[in-house]
Amino acid sequence: CIPKWNRCGPKMDGVPCCEPYTCTSDYYGNCS
């Protein structure tokens, strides 16, 4: 999973943010 504040894009790479954080965008955001 991706740690808090790191870049994320679950629709692109399929990797979720670590609990309890969520990505601010499906394609290009950060975990918060």
UniProtKB/Swiss-Prot annotation:
Record function comment: Alpha-amylase inhibitor. It is active against alpha-amylases from Tribolium castaneum and Prostephanus truncatus larvae.
Disulfide bond among keywords: yes
Disulfide bonds: C1-C18, C8-C23, C17-C31
Name used for this protein in its record: Alpha-amylase inhibitor AAI
InterPro entries hit by this protein: Proteinase_amylase_inhib_sf
The keyword Disulfide bond is assigned to this record: yes
Summary of the tissues where the protein is detected: Endosperm.
Domain of life: Eukaryota
Swiss-Prot/TrEMBL domain comment: The presence of a 'disulfide through disulfide knot' structurally defines this protein as a knottin.
Keywords per UniProt: Alpha-amylase inhibitor, Disulfide bond, Knottin
Example GO molecular function: alpha-amylase inhibitor activity
Source species of the chain: Amaranthus hypochondriacus
